Design a protein with these regions (language model features):
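Short runs within selected transmembrane alpha-helices of multi-pass transporters and secretion channels
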Residues: 1-7, 40, 44, 73-76, ...
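Interhelical loop/hinge segments that connect adjacent transmembrane helices in multipass membrane
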Residues: 3-48, 93-109, 230-244
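Primarily residues marking transmembrane-helix entry/exit sites
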Residues: 26-34, 70, 115-116, 147-148
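Short helix-kink/termination motifs in transmembrane helices of multi-pass secondary transporters
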Residues: 34, 38, 42-54, 58, ...
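Helix-terminus/linker motif at the lipid-water interface of multi-pass membrane proteins
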Residues: 38, 42-78, 93-97, 134-144, ...
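Interfacial segments at transmembrane-helix termini and the short loops linking adjacent helices
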Residues: 63, 129-160
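Helix-loop junctions and terminal segments of transmembrane helices
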Residues: 72-115, 119, 169-174
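Transmembrane alpha-helical segments of multi-pass transport proteins
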Residues: 188-191, 241-258
């Protein structure tokens, strides 16, 4: 596809890129940005497949355990897909605001507005699954996969934190400040491997999913929120004062239906 696109640009549009006069600082920034994005994607892939690989090495869990765990993790991917649609729409606006040197207070206000919309989506999907997910899994794949419900909850609830803060992620991408996030992800990925190895034998696939959820809360929740607040100068306490209460009503409904 890329080759066809290059041919189209050169032959049909008659556009010939020139690389001889590129400023050195621009090349340096491009390489730095691309490198951290590349490393981040690799770590993200490793993080998402760690539990499955470790579970697969345990004879008693190698077949059924992997299948059940995969079903549970599927719901995490679903809720991320629901939220990512809005993120793609607002990314150009966030980039423009960052490049225009918009104040931190205005970026925070935008983060709150978009975060509230994302919270509606995330809380609706998550609360619906928590309330009716066990019955749905039993109907979908059978009662033998009942542990997939616990796995899904363990990995889905923690992911709600970064999903309502996607604007903050777009901001640090636009500012080319992904280095810290990449290091944090590498750290929690290592912690996830160690924790999963220690817990999977004693607590099975549910233990593995709980460890993954806890490391996600530590990295994406506590550490990254500190970074957004202290280093990127976003008003994170104000954000959670406005967005956090929106989770209360869905949580009450979940408790009533469980």
């Amino acid at each position: 596809t890329r080759i066809v696109y290059m041919i189209y640009v050169k032959k049909v549009l008659s556009i010939k890129p020139r690389y001889d006069n590129l400023p050195k600082y621009l090349i340096k920034e491009l390489l730095s940005f691309s490198m951290w994005i590349f490393i981040m994607n690799i770590i993200d892939k490793l993080y998402s497949t760690t539990d499955t690989l470790i579970i697969g090495y345990i004879p008693s869990l190698a077949t059924v355990g992997v299948a059940v765990y995969s079903v549970g993790v599927t719901f995490q991917g679903m809720i991320q897909s629901f939220s990512s649609g809005l993120t793609g729409v607002i990314t150009p606006k966030i980039n423009m605001m960052v490049f225009s040197n918009t104040s931190s207070s205005e970026l925070t206000n935008t983060m709150i507005r978009i975060g509230r919309l994302q919270c509606y989506i995330v809380s609706l999907v998550a609360s619906g699954f928590i309330a009716f997910g066990q019955d749905f899994i039993n109907l979908w794949v059978g009662s033998g996969y009942s542990e997939a419900y616990c796995v899904a909850i363990s990995v889905t609830i923690p992911v709600c934190i970064p999903l309502v803060q996607n604007v903050a992620l777009n901001i640090i991408i636009a500012q080319n400040k992904l280095k810290f996030r990449t290091i944090v992800f590498a750290g929690i990925a290592i912690a996830n491997v160690i924790g999963t190895v220690l817990c999977v034998n004693a607590f099975g696939i549910v233990g593995a999913s709980v460890v993954t959820g806890c490391t996600y809360v530590l990295g994406q929740g506590l550490i990254m929120n500190w970074y957004y607040w202290k280093k990127i100068k976003l008003d994170i306490p104000k954000f959670w004062k406005n967005v956090g209460p929106m989770f209360i009503f869905p949580a009450i409904l979940c408790i009533c239906f469980i």
